[in-house]
C-alpha cells in the first residue's frame, strides 16, 4: 500500500510565526517528518530554515536577540520601500536561515513559498529558484518590508491571498496536510487578560492523561508544545500594544477570514 505523503502548511502571522518552530519540533518528537513543506510569509522563512537544517540556529537567535538586535533592521528614514532595511534583512536571512546561494531544488523535499502579485492581486508560487529571494517576496508585508521585483512583477506578502497554503501543499505532492493557522481567533485576542492563574493555565495531571488517552491526544500535545514555546519567548507583563502589533493585527483580520474559507473548501 502506498504511504500517504504528509504536507506541512505554515501560515502567515507576523511575530506569532516563531510558534512554527515549536510545532515542527513537536511533530518531529512524535516521529512525524513532513514530505512536503509550503509556507506563507514568516511560515516560508521557518519552513526554509527547517529544510536547510538551521531551525536550531534560528531558534537560538530568537531566544537570545535583544530589542537592539531587532531595531537594527529598521530604516528610520522611511521611504516608499518600507521601514525594514533590505540589505540587513538579506544579511539576516543568509546568516540565520539559509546560505545565499541555496536554491529550492537543493532541498531534499518539495518546498513552496507564497507571494502576492501587487499588479493583479494574483498568487505567485516559488517552487524553484533562489530561496532567499522567495522568502523575501513571501514576507514583504506592505509598508514594512520592501517590495520584491520578480521579472515584471512586484511581489508582496503572500498572506494577502493565501494565508495558510494548504492547497499548495496538495499541488506539490501532499496527500495529507497538517496546517498551522496563526491567525485563528485573532480578533478580540488582546481584549483577554494576559494574566492567568496557574490552575487555569496548566492542565492537571489527570487532564493530561485524558488528553493522551483520547483520539485527539497527539494534536493536543503538539498544540500545548507550540503554546508553551511561544509563551516562553514572548512572555511579558506589558499590556500595551506597539505600532507593529496594531498594524499587523489589523492586516491579519482579513487573512483570518480568508483562511477559514480556503480551509473549508
Regions found by a protein language model. Name each.
Residues 1-40, 48-265:
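Patatin-like phospholipase
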